[in-house]
């Protein structure tokens, strides 16, 4: 039957065709989310592709479980994630680290995800008991790795707490010594006088030591070299620098040694 609305001699247009790929099955959300998670360069320190882009590696198990899994899958169960990988045919290819591979899960080949099919729970070549044993072995391995990671975190936390306790203990000890020092200084004027004598003695010892060191250093230069430095004006500058260094050494020794000795329990007891 001719179409009355078409001009004479014109062929009718071809019927509409379905869009290419319209009826193709989209990859499962688990595979899509896993691909996006592995492909994100911002989290390469946690999970990333291997060098060849044929597998992915979980580098930081703790961060992967506590940060990435909740972000993409709304849970933090690494064992559950491993079970999902197994159902889609992924295999663990490295015994010493969490590295997984699938022939259709490749870097830059997102379109291949649709080829990954979910495996049937039972196949004719395997018995239910055999599959259950393999699943239990994989879960045991996952749990053992999680235990190792938790123990490492626990050890790190213990070391940090111990260091903080030592710092607090040292601060409290210095506070007690300072309070004892101030109390005795207020009660006995002779106490302060004796401490000042100790300080002067300490300064004199340091000055004598520094003078001896300078003399030994100067003796290594000939009189002609010293005279040449004096004529060029470097001798005075050298002496000024030596005096500044000497003053810094004395102040540092007093800060590091004198007050540490002064605030010690033995020193406070001997001056009382």
From Swiss-Prot:
It is found in: Nucleus. One of its GO terms (cellular component) is nucleus. Residues 1-26, 203-223 are annotated as: Disordered. Gene3D superfamilies: Winged helix-like DNA-binding domain superfamily/Winged helix DNA-binding domain. This is Heat stress transcription factor A-7a. The keyword Chaperone does not apply. Pfam families: HSF_DNA-bind (PF00447). The keyword Transport does not apply. Belongs to the HSF family. Class A subfamily. Transmembrane segments: none annotated. Transcriptional activator that specifically binds DNA sequence 5'-AGAAnnTTCT-3' known as heat shock promoter elements (HSE). GO terms for biological process: response to heat. InterPro entries: HSF_DNA-bd (IPR000232), WH-like_DNA-bd_sf (IPR036388), WH_DNA-bd_sf (IPR036390). SUPFAM superfamilies: Winged helix' DNA-binding domain (SSF46785). The hydrophobic-rich region (HR-A/B) corresponds to the oligomerization domain. AHA motif is a transcriptional activator element. A motif (AHA) lies at residues 256-265. Keywords: Activator, DNA-binding, Nucleus, Phosphoprotein, Stress response, Transcription, Transcription regulation. Exhibits temperature-dependent phosphorylation.
